Amino acid sequence: MNFYNIFVFVALILAITIGQSEAGWLKKIGKKIERVGQHTRDATIQGLGVAQQAPNVAATARG
């Protein structure tokens, strides 16, 4: 029973220590994912602008 308590305590300390040291690595991945999301958003906005202008171009071409 005493071994179990010591094991849980050591595991908890290890988890806290590793979690704090790995935050930089996780933050870098989060920033990359956020950047991809921003690029996707910007491309979608540009695509919608082109799609909204297409009917005007078609109407102008018909006369």
Curated annotation (Swiss-Prot):
Transmembrane segments: none annotated. The modification Arginine amide is found at residue 62. It is found in: Secreted. One of its GO terms (biological process) is antibacterial humoral response. Its main location: secreted. GO terms for cellular component: extracellular region; extracellular space. Residues 1-19 form the signal peptide. Keywords: Amidation, Antibiotic, Antimicrobial, Immunity, Innate immunity, Secreted, Signal. Belongs to the cecropin family. Cecropins have lytic and antibacterial activity against several Gram-positive and Gram-negative bacteria. This is Cecropin-A1. It comes from Drosophila simulans (Fruit fly). The gene is CecA1.
